[in-house]
């Protein structure tokens, strides 16, 4: 079972580390190509491209210019501990033990606009480059054209290494669009998390993101390997709904609190 999740815009490079173990990203040579493109952008270009404030644009221009392999624990941080968005609030990797990190390293991957595909313990330097950004590059008009084949190949390799063909898609649509599903040698299962509001169940972004992280945590800490085991997920009040689920989409619902 291989899980994929999205990265986060919010980063943490300051809190204590839950592990000292680290690995190097596999696609750094490709990342360097994007850095070379990004370094040609002015802060004004970055602000326009990413729809961010001038202050954030200056920060990210500095990050592109400061980006420099080789990565070490002194200038980089393990990806699973560096990302701090809603998904990672649910994941709570800062509470993992060493055996949890070992399982996650084999069974979890993070999609990334700059790094392509990251293992949990892969070191990364701070960046902001969302997959949906239309950054023209040597491979085409956007990051989807840059990463598509490379990511799909890397995921197929990861699937082969961990022993089965089961891929659990816990990434956002923006990020999973960077993968070419028809070329994936995998059965793709997508968990969907619905919350009740005014009597109707729907995807509420903040809750759904956190729930994806909770599902990752549940799989990692219970060392799950089968689809049937996922149906027992019950964290934070969610429950599997067999009536609205299908073979490749597992629906979990949470009722509104009275």
From Swiss-Prot:
Pfam family, one: H2O2_YaaD
GO biological process: response to hydroperoxide
One of the record's GO cellular component terms: cytosol
Entry superkingdom: Bacteria
Cysteines paired by S-S bonds: none
InterPro entries: YaaA
NCBIfam families: PRK02101.1-1, PRK02101.1-3
Family annotation (PANTHER family): PEROXIDE STRESS RESISTANCE PROTEIN YAAA (PTHR30283:SF4), PEROXIDE STRESS RESPONSE PROTEIN YAAA (PTHR30283)
Similarity comment: Belongs to the UPF0246 family.
The protein, known as: UPF0246 protein ETA_07010
Annotated source species: Erwinia tasmaniensis (strain DSM 17950 / CFBP 7177 / CIP 109463 / NCPPB 4357 / Et1/99)
């Amino acid at each position: 079972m291989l899980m994929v999740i999205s990265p986060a815009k919010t980063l943490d490079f300051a809190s204590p580390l839950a592990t000292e173990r680290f690995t190097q990203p596999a696609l750094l040579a490709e990342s360097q190509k994007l850095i070379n493109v990004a370094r040609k952008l002015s802060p004004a270009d970055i602000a326009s491209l990413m729809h961010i404030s001038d202050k954030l644009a200056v920060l990210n221009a500095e990050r592109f210019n400061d980006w420099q392999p080789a990565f070490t624990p002194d200038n980089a941080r393990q990806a699973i501990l560096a990302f701090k968005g809603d998904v990672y609030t649910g994941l709570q990797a800062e509470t993992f033990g060493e055996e949890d990190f070992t399982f996650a390293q084999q069974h979890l991957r993070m999609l990334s606009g700059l790094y392509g595909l990251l293992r949990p313990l892969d070191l990364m330097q701070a960046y902001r480059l969302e997959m949906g950004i239309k950054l023209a590059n040597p491979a085409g008009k956007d990051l989807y054209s840059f990463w598509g084949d490379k990511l799909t190949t890397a995921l197929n390799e990861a699937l082969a290494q961990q022993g089965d063909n089961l891929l659990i898609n816990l990434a956002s649509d923006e990020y999973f669009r960077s993968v070419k599903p028809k070329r994936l040698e995998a059965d793709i299962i997508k968990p969907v998390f619905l919350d009740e509001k005014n009597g109707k169940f729907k995807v509420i972004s903040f809750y759904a993101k956190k729930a994806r992280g909770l599902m990752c945590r549940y799989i990692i800490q219970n060392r799950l390997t089968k689809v049937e085991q996922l149906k027992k997920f019950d964290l934070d009040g969610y429950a599997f709904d067999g009536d609205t689920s299908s073979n490749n989409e597992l629906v979990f619902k949470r009722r509104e609190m009275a």
